[in-house]
Regions:
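Buried, small/hydrophobic-residue-enriched core segments of structured protein domains
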Residues: 2-151
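Anionic-ligand binding region
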Residues: 146-167
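Residue-level detector of conserved catalytic or cofactor/ligand-binding positions
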Residues: 169-177
Length: 177
């Protein structure tokens, strides 16, 4: 892929930020599209915070909110990532990206389709590779995490959040002073 190829990432939450960071580390141009009020579980490591704060930095990668697609070039020139509020992805047809990555993690498709770019990728469940997008990346923790699926879907959403750290501590005897 050419270094000047445009990659649009829909979503700037914590998992999307990891994807964005990796793409930028490879020297690729990334534009992030977000909603008007993005929600992220781990906000301190989510570039979507730029929507609220005007800019956000995660692991040395700076994101800057822009108000129009035309402002993206000046942000890239600063070595930063532009973040545009465009929940429907209205700018995608005009921007003509080489790749669109759906990292919204809504557990369902909110409008990403294969005709948006020559290569379309979705993170997590709710998409069918070969139908909705070209590839799906497994996001469920475990031995399949990160697997690229070219036909079919990621593991369906169970509705039960994954455990991070300790979930429950059972004390069988009362503690004594």
């Amino acid at each position: 892929m050419k270094k000047d190829a445009l990659i649009i990432v829909r979503g700037g939450g914590d998992l999307a930020t990891g994807t964005i960071h990796r793409l930028c580390s490879a020297g690729l141009r990334v534009l992030v599209l977000e909603t008007t009020q993005p929600a992220a579980i781990r906000r301190q490591v989510a570039l979507c915070e730029a929507v609220y704060e005007g800019e956000a930095t995660v692991e040395g990668l700076r994101a800057v909110r822009i108000e129009a697609l035309e402002q993206a070039q000046s942000v890239w020139a600063q070595g930063a990532v532009p973040v545009l509020v465009d929940p429907e992805g209205a700018c995608i047809a005009r921007a003509k990206p080489e790749v669109v990555v759906d990292a919204i993690l809504a557990k369902r498709n909110l409008g990403t389709s294969r005709d948006m770019a020559p290569l379309t990728i979705a993170l997590g469940p709710g998409f069918v590779a070969g139908q909705d997008v070209d590839a799906v990346v497994e996001t469920k923790r475990g031995h399949r995490l990160g697997r690229i699926i070219r036909e079919g879907s990621a593991i369906p959403n169970t509705g039960i959040p994954g455990v991070i750290g300790l979930s429950l501590i059972h004390i069988s005897e009362p503690t004594r002073p």
